[in-house]
Amino acid sequence: PGRAFFHSRQGGGHKEKKKKRSSIISRIILIICACVFVFAAVRLVSILLEYKKGNDIYDNIEGNVLDDTPVNITIGEDNQDVTIPFVYNHQALLDINPDGLGFLYVPSVDIRLPIAQTTDNDFYLTHTFDKTYNRNGCLFVDYRIKDGLNASHVIIYGHNMGSGAMFGTLARYKNSGFYQTEGNDVFYIYTEDVIREYKIFTVYITDPISDTFTFNFSNLSGLREYAKNVQAESLYNTGVDISNATQVVTFSTCTDDSKQRVIVSGTYVGESKLDNGTSSEASASASE
């Protein structure tokens, strides 16, 4: 009986120790999970605050560069009358940042953003137009492109932000129905003294390194061959004639998984001269 009593005591103590160890392990796991949750929450809040800061910066830039006064212009292939909902001030853009080349307006997705160019393709990946460090970055032209926004092929890079900022809404163009909605096939670029209209002729997905990123063509035949090739890559037939293309502007942004690039390209179709922020005469696209 004494031996049996002794063994019984030993078994009970062993179970209590096991329970205590299990309880300690559970607490440690709980603490680790809580720490991970807190870290993730802090990280998320930090990212959201940075998004907000970036959006606020661009709202301020827009307020300084654009005057919300509608302007009627005559522009495009058929010299159509178009109403632009603002007046652009190029000098105000340069006062913020001399790297500024112009201003992009895409009515279909309400993109209103400045375009910069500097001596590399890295700086504006992590800095806004006013050179503030921010993950929104800035739209920028490839530094190797000569003549900036006047080049025969202009490539403009921008982040695909989850918030929809920058080029975060370009993916809508993968849907042919969106493209075919009236007015969604054009975008505008302001330079120092003109507003130019472009018609989107191709939308496709490509690799980060591909023939898409070819520029500094020596003649128009090279540009037109390029335009023909990238139009063949389009996710759908836009029906746009690019046989007489004189300039192509390409938007490039990451896919959601960052492994590929969404490409939206437009061909120049006309421009309207600016006079103190208002338009005067228009000219149609040159053709040969």
Q: What do these predicted regions represent?
A:
Residues 17-34:
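N-terminal Sec-pathway targeting helices
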Residues 1-15:
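N-terminal targeting leaders characterized by basic, low-complexity, disordered sequences
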